[in-house]
């Protein structure tokens, strides 16, 4: 409030000012580019499949014990709330650097375990320590996400914020593809190089992103005043660049290449990643000093609700529509206790007692989380089907289609008013490919089915991961989204353990102790290994049935929340009509 008062004293009423001057314009776009870089190189959990077999061999553990390590990484996300606690006592850039250092230490320990255990038998790292560093690594990923989320919230108004968040989160899905390109260029036959990159690249990109982040901190509140028309053009350009980047990685990231060709492909990918830098430069040159027509609805006061803007006519209309909806639907079991309006704040206690939350929780738990577990097991799946040589391609496919799924999560905001489908309807539609993929891989376990199934799983889970924050905000209140979303994602470690345990038990039950030569490293190790379709056939069938449950849950959620979205849309139309008539 004090900062806002100073801004008004120095520059007058914010309503008489533009959507941020030249400096504010390029700074907020520079911040967005910084979050894109951070997200693109900090999704280190997505390349677990690239080194999981080697880690299993080095530690001499079973598939079940390996599953515990994957669960530890996902369990770290349950401690994501600690990032919010850190932000209460530390500046944002300090939290970013601390996160990078923690991630560096966690992956450095795993790298030492993988490298030295292969060559020096006397050197061992205790399994509990490896479990702990996997947990820390998973927690650091969640902290990176929080930093990017906060930066987008601080830098963009409510009208532009969903597009900024969607773009930033989308690039997290490309991490595995970028890491694969780096690994192919540096040492394509060594799984350990992924762990080395996991340690170094997030730290490097955090340091690189510091200047725009520090500039963001020095700004007042005036830069929050958006320019919808200008922003729309800039976002269109950024989304085009993002789409080209994703297509580039799909086309070139799937090939087995020579070292020199790999460096050329990597250079091209880095150029595309740097290309959004032209936006801040162009924004400062072509910025039009046009007032924001939606300025009265902007959020200059950080203590005000993010999305609750009700005028008196809105409140009257809302109550009238609530009575109508309750009268028409009150007798249906499906509608009992459902949400009536969007953006209504839910405390944690109220959230736990809300039927719609548990439908949403089930849809996530039986949908996107299954996709995440699939990506963790992709290394063993490829190995069991004699597709180990195609693992790099499969990682690139999963990563790229996860990216496109995340990118598509912006459709509800881009098509707002043109295609009035509730966001929960988009969520249900996104879950449709998931059971199709698992049943396809259950019936036909070969290279082509594996590639198609991996693409569908990546597309579906990517959309849900990116859309989840917006869905949580709309259904249960924007000001409670931090707490409520952290409650939601407790399903990730639970699902990681449960679904991973199913896969591990089926794998170990059908496997046998044998000497296996890794085609990538040439090292022969004695371990429990399973080869053939029997290793994951039952798992694919069970995962398919589970995702059908998630799809059914999302459809019920859509059915229950559709009237609430209709109420909000009608209120928005009424507001626009009232403004025009006045």
Regions found by a protein language model. Give the residues of each.
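Hydrophobic core of transmembrane alpha-helices in multi-pass small-molecule transporters
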Residues: 106, 119-144, 449-463
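Helix-to-loop junctions at the C-terminal end of transmembrane segments
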Residues: 79-96, 289, 405-421, 507
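Central cavity-lining transmembrane alpha-helices of secondary-active solute carriers
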Residues: 68-89, 105-108, 112, 177, ...
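Extracytoplasmic gate region of multi-pass secondary transporters
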Residues: 45-55, 248-261, 341-343, 347-404, ...
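C-terminal ends and interior cores of transmembrane alpha-helices
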Residues: 101-123, 249, 253, 433-445, ...
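Long, low-complexity inter-transmembrane loops of multi-pass membrane transporters
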Residues: 1-17, 213-353, 359, 564-582
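C-terminal transmembrane helical hairpin of 12-TM major facilitator-type secondary transporters
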Residues: 353-378, 383-409, 413-471
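Intracellular juxtamembrane helix-capping segments at the cytosolic ends
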Residues: 48-51, 55, 141-167, 179-180, ...
